[in-house]
Amino acid sequence: MASLREIQMRITSTQSTKQITKAMNMVSASKLNRAQGNNANFKPYMDKLQEVISSIAGGTSGATHPMLQVRPVKRTGYIVITSDRGLAGGYNASVLRDVYRELKDKHTSTDEYRLYVIGKVGVQFFKSRNIPVYSAMTGLNDQPTFVEVAEIVKQTVGAFSEGEIDELKLCYNSFISVISQEVKIQQLLPLGDIEQSASNVMYEYEPEEETILAALLPRYAEGLIYGALLDAKVSEHAARMTAMSSATDNADELIRGLKLKFNRARQAAITQEITEIVGGASALE
């Protein structure tokens, strides 16, 4: 049986860990609230942009753009969004597992895909499996700005426009609730299925519609990537908050068990001492 000193040291150590996980839970809750606000503030911009683009693409003018046209797929680009830090439950593992499975199931050679990875966890995951990472981005803020992701947006949209990749997919955790996130692997380019707006507003365009499409479609693709990153950040903070809450609860349970063990050990030690005293007194009679 462990000594009283050893048990007390374990209790003290677990209490220190509990303080850390509780603080991390509170920090993640604050970051989650801000991330949800950022996500909500970005949505009206994307809704209006989608409304205009769907009006043009679904109109009768026949306006087209290369970003709308499907072509034979020889190489697929994947934007994989993970975090720079762990301690977030299954947040990273779930999206990396699904992407890894798709790479193995749909491709026979590394020449058939390019990985654009956001987050240290994702970069380390693929490199440890000898899977080439074409471009990596790490060190993003917990509340990312569009300027921060502009480079990877430029790389991916540019690669599609130049014909270096024939389709582009977004892979990330989408926020469902604080305790639930859903992995999404969705096609970003070509933009073949822009959702039709529910608005019945009719627009008159100046200059011609194809010129407007040429200006707006890259912005729309960039917005989809940035929106996915905002959504993923909400999921990350929610997952970390839930994980730290669970860790704090587990620490409480462990402390209760250790205290019970400590009390039993102390009681056994006292009983042993009394027995020895009584035995010694009896021997003197």
Swiss-Prot record:
GO BP terms, alphabetized: proton motive force-driven plasma membrane ATP synthesis
GO MF, one term, reads:
proton-transporting ATP synthase activity, rotational mechanism
This protein's UniProt keywords:
ATP synthesis, Cell membrane, CF(1), Hydrogen ion transport, Ion transport, Membrane, Transport
Q: What is its main location?
A: membrane
**Where is it localised?**
Cell membrane
Q: Where does the source fall among the domains of life? A: Bacteria
Membrane topology term? Peripheral membrane protein
What InterPro entries does this protein's entry cite?
ATP_synth_F1_ATPase_gsu, ATP_synth_F1_gsu, ATP_synth_F1_gsu_CS
Q: What GO cellular-component annotations does this UniProt entry give?
A: plasma membrane; proton-transporting ATP synthase complex
| PROSITE patterns per record | ATPASE_GAMMA
User: What NCBIfam families does the entry give?
Assistant: ATPsyn_F1gamma
Show the PANTHER family listed in the entry. Answer: ATP SYNTHASE GAMMA CHAIN, ATP SYNTHASE SUBUNIT GAMMA, MITOCHONDRIAL
Q: Which family does it belong to?
A: Belongs to the ATPase gamma chain family.
Which function does this protein serve?
Produces ATP from ADP in the presence of a proton gradient across the membrane. The gamma chain is believed to be important in regulating ATPase activity and the flow of protons through the CF(0) complex.
**How does this protein assemble?**
F-type ATPases have 2 components, CF(1) - the catalytic core - and CF(0) - the membrane proton channel. CF(1) has five subunits: alpha(3), beta(3), gamma(1), delta(1), epsilon(1). CF(0) has three main subunits: a, b and c.
Q: What is this protein called?
A: ATP synthase gamma chain
